[in-house]
């Protein structure tokens, strides 16, 4: 009984992980039920006979999870069957001309030669990537038709029936796959790359995102205000970490480890890109979409993830510099990490919306500017009294962070190439981290941490509203008080000038 419960739990977990798997299972059952009518419906059985089993076999081996995989396998199988069928008929005709004695010998030679050559060609990397299944079916079909033809007088009729049933089975798979709850490999690849961007940005930015939105004097301040708790490189390496309890430490460690899934995503990306090439245009993805460029972006993201993995090990190294040095280096390091994370986050959002990542350029430039500030600080001789072992650990970590910034710039360039090739639309300016407002409903937010857990938010709008009081530089000051109770976050906002409004967010 316990085994049954375990199987049920596993089934629920698999279905919850991706509900499309349940739909795919029903689709396979539907196609098999349709092609089985070759046996149940007498006129169809009279036409094809036992060769109807080839339609069933085609459905079983061709129907895959995504449209691209199904199309690829289906077209490969049909093409291989047609080609092998034609060659099989030709081989049988040539062998029959040699008489009863020489016919089996020649057929054996033909089967040996084509099987040996086809198997060798399967080792070619490009062929193996896209046409391995086609060659496998070619070997099987040629051998079966050649051998069957030796005992079957009407070899052409036999070949026609088998090819027809294979085509019918393949078409059934393709039609159901495309028109009944389709799963597009291209969309999955697109989402995977965007998700990888987010995982890297999560490490660099931190693991706490608080969304605050309010209405101050009937002015929509923001769609989303992101107040980052900077658990990034600067905070983690250059500040004294307080004891938050074992549960909090474990949770944060688990959140930061999300980037590790990017390290092993290469095979998944390549298979999705290969399947996506077979798919017709769908949604925002036109035919011959530049899927190869997605692989280039994914490769650079993976290189960045390896740098982050190495950096993470140095963050937890035993040899740490003194608190004074940490405080002096904290600000530029924090800016380098934060701006890189912002650029990654903006690129993720741009890719999801298929817009050009124009706002990421500013964050990359800010990160490079912080890198120059750090270089000037190091040239000032701040590390003269640091112990050699501590110095090695510190400089290695800094070098890795600089590499991350350089890779972020390369990723951005590669994403620009993808945006141009895929004809992404121009972005409507509403970046999450904009420094200057572009419209009435969008404002820039600068937070200044005060005593305890109070934060003063300086909010700047376009200056077209006279109902709200401003300070001398045209900005509004809002005092934010934040409390944490259990798992909820309560935020109270009050305008310093007029005390107009408050908001609570969970």
UniProtKB/Swiss-Prot annotation:
Transmembrane regions listed in the UniProt entry: 28-48, 52-72, 78-98, 104-124, 130-150, 166-186
Topological type in the membrane: Multi-pass membrane protein
Keyword RNA-binding: no
Disordered: annotated segments: 461-485
Highest taxon in the source lineage: Eukaryota
Ranges of biased composition (kind: Basic and acidic residues): 467-485
UniProtKB keywords: Ion channel, Ion transport, Membrane, Transmembrane, Transmembrane helix, Transport
Protein localization: Membrane
GO cellular component: membrane
Swiss-Prot/TrEMBL GO biological process terms: malate transport; monoatomic ion transmembrane transport
Matches recorded under Pfam families: ALMT
Described purpose of this protein according to its UniProt entry: Malate transporter.
Family: Belongs to the aromatic acid exporter (TC 2.A.85) family.
PANTHER family on file: ALUMINUM-ACTIVATED MALATE TRANSPORTER 10
Name of the protein in question: Aluminum-activated malate transporter 7
